[in-house]
Amino acid sequence: MNDWMPIAKEYDPLKAGSIDGTDEDPHDRAVWRAMLARYTPNKGVTGDPLLTLFVARLNLQTKEEKLKEVFSRYGDIRRLRLVRDLVTGFSKGYAFIEYKDERSLLKAYRDADGLVIDQHEIFVDYELERTLKGWIPRRLGGGLGGKKESGQLRFGGRDRPFRKPINLPVVKNDQFREGKRERRERSRSRERHWDSRMRDHHDRGREKRWQEREPARAWPEGDWERERDFRDDRVKGREKRDRSK
């Protein structure tokens, strides 16, 4: 596939539900729900989406001050928002950090992913809600990433990029039959040749007895031909598999 990309450039719920982005039918109800959903980004969110990072898998006890301390190492922060439950005020375990310049954003994106903060290994990605066309959040069956235990894995993002599809060669039936017919004809030709040689050998054997038996088995010519053909087929098959990888 010449247009294959590990990271989605546009959000498609059906493709996101497939490990290689090739599914043609939804495999669970959440994918169906995401395909039917219509989502409009929150207009109350401010700041430049192209300078904003999404930070997830935070310890629920991690505070804004700690995040600012860690992420200010990469550049000047314009805005930091730790998302909290509206009722309880408890952290939901993710935040958005807006930098003042792109250089700081890229440095944090590259170096902060996988950092351990308050005994939790964090995940860092670009903000997608306002930057990825067609975005559907996880609560509507979409999103990206996730864990196997959740039963809602989504592919095409930094956490779980698409795997490259495996393109198996298609053999047409008529080509298969033609090749099979040719192999049968070659096999019959070798068998006729072999029968003729065996009859000659049997006749000569009546006139002369072996004085001693050879220590090792001598392969008749027909067997050598079969063995050579077998090896050639194995080599061709291995080369074909190597080219298809």
Curated annotation (Swiss-Prot):
Listed CDD domains: RRM_snRNP35 (cd12237)
InterPro entries in UniProt: Nucleotide-bd_a/b_plait_sf, RBD_domain_sf, RRM_dom, snRNP35_RRM, U1_U11-U12_snRNP_70-35kDa
Cellular component, GO, one term: U12-type spliceosomal complex
Glycyl lysine isopeptide (Lys-Gly) (interchain with G-Cter in SUMO2) cross-link site: 172
Keyword hit for Repressor: no
GO aspect biological process, one term: mRNA splicing, via spliceosome
UniProt keyword Ubl conjugation present: yes
Region: Disordered, residue numbers: 146-165, 173-222
Keywords assigned by UniProt, alphabetized: Isopeptide bond, mRNA processing, mRNA splicing, Nucleus, RNA-binding, Spliceosome, Ubl conjugation
Name of protein: U11/U12 small nuclear ribonucleoprotein 35 kDa protein
Species in which this protein is naturally found: Bos taurus (Bovine)
Upper lineage: Eukaryota, Metazoa, Chordata, Craniata, Vertebrata
Encoding gene (name): SNRNP35
